[in-house]
Design a protein with these regions (language model features):
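Alpha-helical architecture feature
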Residues: 3-11, 19-71, 80-87, 98-255
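Membrane-interfacial loop-to-helix junctions in multi-pass transporters
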Residues: 76-77
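Catalytic phosphate-handling regions of large nucleic-acid enzymes and associated NTPases
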Residues: 16
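Charged, solvent-exposed structural "stalk/scaffold" segments
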Residues: 92-98
Length: 255
């Protein structure tokens, strides 16, 4: 019971009113059942993403499903995804990149063994460097013939820019050493390996595929819980009913 109460305190501390608590509690419960982390940990991640991407209460269930599917479809685990998104989300929001696209980037990096805060800082560097390239980075992109903003000065879609960079490398027949130089100049030494992974994932269509799967993820957390119920049987049902009893108690107290 402490866990669910703690989760609701976290939701409230994150600026959640009664509506937010009612929207987020069942989502947090299902996430905890699906990923076996505490409701408090799940509430903190859920509300962190809600606020970073400035999403409304009616999007809370969708955020939960996007997070569940990121762990389901990529090598990202709870801690890795949580750390990575904490770093990347605020910059992504500023760059006009959606939660689904950000989760796709973080997931693709985990698949390539770039995990946790490294995936977060890598994604963040790629987004911020492409949003407002300066100095040598700007010159390097110009040499490659890649534009980062449209005629109105808005940042072009990040996946498109990454695809065009890859295409330019191929068209200009740049060797691996030359490519590495460009990547370092544009993205910085630290983030260049993450940028290379994301560029490849953009070019193969992996980022688009993951983004599409995450956009269509509504109801997937509940599905995962149902599958676990079928596979784990009695033990899981006891665990679940204990959790759900707590959820209903808390709602009754509020009303």
């Amino acid at each position: 019971a402490d866990d669910a109460a703690g989760a609701q305190i976290i939701i409230a501390k994150a600026g959640g009113d009664v509506d937010a608590i009612q929207a987020a509690t069942p989502v947090t419960l299902n996430m905890a059942l699906a990923n076996r982390r505490t409701m408090e940990e799940n509430a903190a991640l859920l509300m962190g993403m809600k606020s970073a991407f400035q999403l409304s209460n009616d999007k809370v269930a969708h955020i939960g499903d996007v997070l569940s599917m990121t762990m389901n479809k990529t090598a990202a685990d709870f801690d890795g995804m949580s750390d990575a998104l904490t770093y990347a989300a605020p910059v992504a929001k500023n760059a006009g990149v959606s939660i689904e696209e950000t989760a796709a980037m973080v997931g693709a990096l985990h698949d390539a063994k770039i995990t946790g805060s490294m995936a977060g800082t890598g994604s963040r560097a790629v987004l911020s460097r492409l949003q407002a390239p300066t100095g040598k980075a700007w010159d390097a992109l110009k040499e490659l013939g890649v534009k980062t903003s449209d005629s109105k000065g808005n940042t072009r879609p990040v996946f498109t820019i990454l695809k065009e960079m890859q295409a330019s490398f191929e068209k200009n027949r740049l060797g691996t050493a030359q490519q590495a130089e460009y990547m370092k100049t544009i993205f910085g030494e630290e983030a260049s390996s993450a940028a290379a992974v994301l560029m490849a994932a953009a070019s193969t269509g992996k980022l688009d595929k993951l983004t599409a799967a995450f956009k269509a993820s509504d109801g997937k957390t509940a599905e995962l819980v149902n599958i676990m119920q079928d596979n784990l049987g009695g033990d899981f049902k006891e665990f679940q009913s204990a959790y759900e009893a707590v959820g209903t108690d808390l709602f009754d107290q509020q009303e």
